[in-house]
Curated annotation (Swiss-Prot):
Annotated protein name in UniProt: Gamma-glutamyl phosphate reductase
GO MF assignments: glutamate-5-semialdehyde dehydrogenase activity; NADP binding
Physiological role: Catalyzes the NADPH-dependent reduction of L-glutamate 5-phosphate into L-glutamate 5-semialdehyde and phosphate. The product spontaneously undergoes cyclization to form 1-pyrroline-5-carboxylate.
Main localization, broad class: cytoplasm
Organism: Dechloromonas aromatica (strain RCB)
Enzymatic reactions: L-glutamate 5-semialdehyde + phosphate + NADP(+) = L-glutamyl 5-phosphate + NADPH + H(+)
GO BP terms, alphabetized: L-proline biosynthetic process
UniProt subcellular location: Cytoplasm
Length: 418
């Protein structure tokens, strides 16, 4: 296969489809989404079977446990995928919305209209559900999508893509509105991230290695989805019951997600009280505790944490723990070591909670709630295309609005500039 020729064909088809989608009605887009959801639900067994083939190959290749967790698609997962697509159909269509219309002294009206970005290239690892989520969000926001999933999920992604195409055609929209790159050749990624004439933005979802490569090589603007080294800080006035419940949920509900807590900070004044029950809970659940010297003095089974531990997204039953002198050190530590994804403070002190909100430099900051809430569905955005750790264009969970832009509109009635 001539990868450059193939990718340029995909790009041209996506650009043509994006022009049709920009003018598609809400009814057309919703009809396609509902048809896609129905097809996914109907073919649940076939999707699970395709995914099992991917899993078998992945295990044989020695894929790590966290990646296998992300790759797995059960019948329940297929149903959740269909429901996610249906939910996007219920969301308000942002395209064409006009805001901030104001009269100017000249008599003209000036405002903004929300419009699609155009063609979105999405690069991701494992997680076949991203194929359906991304297709749905791009479609509803009027964008064409070029999807490049991980090679480990190629069979799952092909099966999902076929159902997406079926739904698009049933609604009278171009099948090329959503294209899954049908090759595992890494050269396809190199082409995708340099096709500025066809692709308007790249959304990468993957590990540091992938992001680093794309940052170095991409000629197309990116919305970064970096790793999730998330923190929970137990402040001096943390409620012990809330602290235990939130740490348990944030760390142990799922280990392989980017909104899982990887580091726990505890105020020195309450460490001796809060750490023993939390450590007992974590140990009972098989979580390895890596702590500072003060943590080790309180938790005998904790092993010594290294500097690298505090930077690490484990995606595994491991947590780093550090005792801090107070909120100043907690904020400083988080801003230095976190990936700027999601952080939580547990406290009944409102002024300190508000200071934490203001000063912690992350996409999502929470008070007395689990970091696991950092999710487009939980935020009411519907399925998300990723969680951006960037500051420009979109930050945090990226839903429909994050996949749009605004253009200025001027309304006149024969007005000329004097």
């Amino acid at each position: 296969m001539d990868i450059k020729h193939y990718m340029h064909t995909v790009g041209r088809q996506a650009r043509a489809a994006s022009r049709r989608l920009a003018g598609a009605t809400t009814a057309e887009k919703n009809a396609a989404l509902l048809a896609i959801a129905a097809a996914i639900r109907r073919e649940s067994a076939a999707l699970v079977a395709a995914n099992q083939e991917d899993l078998t190959a992945a295990r044989a290749a020695g894929l790590e446990t966290a990646m296998l967790d992300r790759l797995t698609l059960s019948a329940k997962g297929v149903e959740s995928m269909a429901e996610g697509v249906e939910q996007v159909a219920t969301l308000a269509d942002p395209i064409g919305e006009m805001t901030d219309i104001k009269y100017r002294p000249s008599g003209i009206q000036v405002g903004k209209m929300r419009v699609p970005l155009g063609v979105i290239g999405i690069i991701y690892e494992a997680r076949p559900n991203v194929t359906a989520d991304a297709a749905a969000l791009c479609l509803k926001s009027g964008n064409a999508a070029i999807l490049r999933g991980g090679s480990e999920a190629i069979r799952s992604n092909r099966a999902i893509a076929a159902l997406v195409h079926e739904g698009l055609k049933a609604a009278g929209l171009p099948a090329e509105s959503v294209q899954v790159i049908d090759t595992t050749d890494r050269a396809a990624v190199g082409e995708l991230i340099t096709m500025r004439e066809f692709v308007d933005v790249i959304v990468p979802r993957g590990g540091k290695g992938l992001i680093a490569r794309l940052l170095a090589e991409s000629r197309v603007p990116m919305i970064q989805h970096l790793d999730g080294n998330c923190h929970v800080y137990l402040e001096a006035e943390a409620d012990p019951a809330k602290a235990l419940k939130i740490v348990e949920n944030a760390k142990t509900q799922r280990y392989g997600t980017c909104n899982t807590a990887e580091s726990l900070l505890v105020d020195r004044s309450v460490a001796a009280m809060l750490l023993p029950p939390i450590a007992a809970m974590l140990t009972a659940k098989g979580v390895e505790i890596r702590g500072c010297a003060e943590t080790q003095a309180i938790v005998p089974n904790a092993i010594a944490a290294t500097e690298e531990d505090y930077y690490t997204e484990y995606l595994a039953p491991i947590i780093s723990v550090k005792v801090v002198s107070g909120i100043d050190e907690a904020i400083e530590h988080i801003n230095q070591y976190s990936s700027h994804h999601s952080e939580a403070i547990i406290t009944d002190n409102h002024p300190k909670a508000m200071r934490f909100l203001r000063e912690v430099d992350s996409a999502s900051v929470m008070i007395n709630a689990s970091t696991r809430f950092a999710d487009g569905f939980e935020y009411g955005l519907g399925a998300e295309i990723g969680i951006s750790t960037d500051k420009i264009h979109a930050r945090g969970p990226v839903g429909l609005e994050g996949l749009t832009s605004q253009k200025w509109v001027v309304l006149g009635d024969g007005h000329v500039r004097g």
